[in-house]
Regions:
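A conditional alpha-helix N-cap/helix-loop micro-motif detector
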Residues: 96-99, 150, 169-173, 210, ...
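Non-catalytic C-terminal accessory region of glycerolipid acyltransferases
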Residues: 2, 40, 58, 62-63, ...
Length: 304
């Protein structure tokens, strides 16, 4: 508690500062902080380089690697600054700074009366997808969020999202029921799908290696009839741009588990193409494949 309260205070202070000062003033500071984190986070830097190498299909020239790792940390710093700035923006300002292609896929699914599932990677400004949708007439938005530590910061972020009209569903044992209820109410549900935090997901081939992703999106789609729509939100110079892809087919073609695996693999295949458009905006700084854990063990033991 002693540590967590100052963290919440610091985040509130940062949010207040970025709302006051113009982007051109804040950007050099956020890039400086990104550089500090880069220099003092050996393991994160190592993992980001590995993940970038995957997205470039192991064709990333060594001379370009350092600059692209640096850019990844910079875009991640911008994600946090933009999220803090979002708190002070009106619906008009959000809408003015957001462009989207393929929105008809969300509209068509929503008009069918069963809330669609937006499958997103940790890419660019993913928070803006849900925030922008709250600006649209008639749309209710539910977001599934990962637990954060300390608890006070997590609670603060939940209240922050709820202040925009979002229905926040914490990831956990009761999340499935809550998401099903949201889908039945025709909410647009936002799910991050490129990391299996709980380690109980379905096996897929993702950027050349087998790993797991959450089985939730495919499972929920089969049980409710919801459309799964892959979406990515990219950072642009002074705005954000969303790409909405056609829905993944949720028609049954085999046993339940087989259909979950098939749909999950289709999700991953689309996410790969979305990530490869802007690899340096993929904010995956944790081990995500079995070989990552072995590599981390080697680096900790000094073998790398």
């Amino acid at each position: 508690m002693i540590v967590s309260k100052p963290l919440v205070f610091i985040y509130r202070a940062i949010a207040a500062i970025v709302r006051i000062f113009p982007v051109k003033f804040v950007t050099p500071i956020q890039n400086f902080v990104a550089r500090l984190v880069l220099n003092f986070s050996k393991e994160r830097k190592f993992l980001v380089r590995r993940h970038l190498n995957r997205t470039y299909e192991k064709n990333l020239p060594a001379k370009d690697s350092e600059e692209k790792v640096k850019k990844t940390f910079q875009t991640y710093a911008r994600y946090w600054v933009d999220s803090a700035r979002m708190q002070g923006l009106s619906d008009f300002q959000i809408d003015s700074g957001f462009t989207v292609e393929g929105f008809e896929h969300i509209e068509n699914a929503w008009e069918a009366g069963v809330g669609p599932i937006l499958a997103l990677p940790h890419l660019g400004g993913w928070e803006w997808a849900g925030r922008w949708l709250t600006c649209r007439p008639n749309y209710e938005v539910s977001v599934v969020v990962e637990p954060q530590k300390p608890r006070e910061l997590f609670d603060f972020m939940v209240k922050y999202r709820e202040s925009f009209g979002m229905n926040v569903i914490p990831l956990g044992p009761e999340a499935g029921k809550a998401v099903i209820n949201a889908i039945k109410k025709n909410h647009v549900v936002c799910l991050l799908c490129d990391r299996d935090i709980e380690g109980k997901g379905v096996k897929v081939h993702f950027f050349g290696e087998e790993t797991t992703i959450p089985a939730g999106p495919a499972t929920l789609a089969i049980r409710t009839g919801a459309k799964i729509i892959p979406v990515a939100v990219y950072q642009k110079k002074n705005s954000h741009h969303a790409v909405v892809c056609p829905p993944i087919s949720s028609e049954r073609s085999g046993k339940f588990r087989e259909d979950v695996e098939r749909m999950s693999q289709e999700i991953v295949t689309v996410l790969e193409s979305l990530i490869q458009k802007e690899p340096e905006q993929w904010h995956l700084m944790q081990p995500n494949w079995p070989s990552d854990f072995k590599a981390l063990k080697d680096i900790r033991s000094g073998r790398i």
